[in-house]
Amino acid sequence: MSSKQEKTKARLPRGFVDRTSAQLYAIEVMIAQIRQVYELYGFEALETPIFEYTDVLGKFLPDEDRPNAGVFSLQDDDEQWMSLRYDLTAPLARYFSENFETLPKPYRSYRLGFVFRNEKPGPGRFRQFMQFDADIVGTPTVAADAEICMMAADSLQKLGFQHHDYVIRLNNRKILDAVLEKVGLAGSEQAQRRLTVLRAIDKLDKFGLEGVRLLLGKGRLDESGDFTKGAELKDKEIDGILSLLTIEVGTAEETFDALRKIVDQSEEGLEGVRELEEMQAIFAENDTQNRIKIDPSVVRGLEYYTGPVFEAALLFDVLNDDGQKVVFGSVGGGGRYDGLVARFRGENIPATGFSIGVSRLIAALQNLGKLPVKEKTGPVVVLMMDKEPEIVARYQKMVMQLRSAGIPAELYLGASGMKAQMKYADRRQAPCVVIQGSQERESGTIQIKDLVEGARLSHEIKDNQTWRESRPAQVTVDEEQLVKTVQDILAAQKR
């Protein structure tokens, strides 16, 4: 056995990412902008825990001992299964049901947080990602669905996307349900096959019509050799479903006429078309019809949607991992889910909502060159020229004086000499450093070096001796002038 202690390998779990300060700043700015829109529409904040009892989440429960199909789960000490939330909607349904008597109805809320999927990771596909949701619970009117769509469009507009950059694509699950009923997929006994069909259609943008056809049939083999089992529908059934996806979208009225023909005499399907017509009238009245379009291919891959479904899609091209141009695609979606709260209350509570994929939006803004960038200015660094306790306390007092004036500052707390400390300040992107050695201390002075100006002048003064003699961008002032001098330097750097 080796006497050396075995080192633990530093490694990140697959499907998870670290986020830098710059990335976090961009996320914070983006979230603040979306929050402004949500609150302008009258929504209030809500936070729920990342863990819920597994039966509360519901959707991914398998017929096996450990409920881990699609979710991360653990068993509590009371032997109850808990799971990390896979979205923010199921926890909202639980919260609304628990607090039904005290909440206003309709209840408008927005939630921000990480969700978790125990799925195969891949490029741009993570097991932990952030969502920003807004929902209205307690009203059946499609005016609520229309308002959610308009709010989604306004959120993208607020982030800097232009009208030609995006579209909110809209359909109604009742129309698809009518088509599924025609091909024999109605009833609870067909629930699993129906869910497989929904997920297959939801891959239309990714795999195209032929890929969806394979997933509706026997299954699809991807480029890596992985096989995804299909819904095993017959060719005639597949053709019936694909006829909905291939409707040519013209004017709104032409699209509605085509949808009525597809659903035939199905009352549920015709009701779905009427709801879309009501929403279209609202969009036209509010001049948003050019940003929100009827698209029969939108289904959303979750079983619990019961009415209008919508998806926010970005329309510009980006390069994929193979260097090919592809449309950026979906950055969020949602719909009506009138049955989700019924699991807790035994009665249908109408609800509708929308979820924005924060990570996808960050990538989109980066592609357009619109990602918020923080000014690359770090804290003022006070160098530690002497490590005697009473001297360290004196340095710390300087730091506190700067902080009290609202100036970010830190005391160098490493063990290196002055040269390494200066390199540290550069790496921290400090605007200036404060230096007080024994000579300055005896005279009650400090040296303040403007690193920004110094870097600029270094390109002009090439001779080392001249540089050392002139000591550019460096001033010596009395200790009591510390704050004012630093303030003047920072102000000059901004000019």
From Swiss-Prot:
Query: By its UniProt entry, which InterPro entries does this protein fall under?
Result: aa-tRNA-synth_II (IPR006195), aa-tRNA-synth_II/BPL/LPL (IPR045864), Anticodon-bd (IPR004154), Anticodon-bd_dom_sf (IPR036621), His-tRNA-ligase (IPR015807), HisRS-like_core (IPR041715), HisRS/HisZ (IPR004516), HisRS_anticodon (IPR033656)
Concerning its family, UniProt says: Belongs to the class-II aminoacyl-tRNA synthetase family.
Gene field: hisS
Q: Which GO terms describe its molecular function?
A: ATP binding; histidine-tRNA ligase activity
- Which reactions is this enzyme annotated as catalysing? tRNA(His) + L-histidine + ATP = L-histidyl-tRNA(His) + AMP + diphosphate + H(+)
EC code(s) of this entry: 6.1.1.21
Annotated signal sequence is: none
- Its protein name is Histidine--tRNA ligase
Give the organism the record lists: Bartonella henselae (strain ATCC 49882 / DSM 28221 / CCUG 30454 / Houston 1) (Rochalimaea henselae)
**Gene Ontology terms: biological process:** histidyl-tRNA aminoacylation
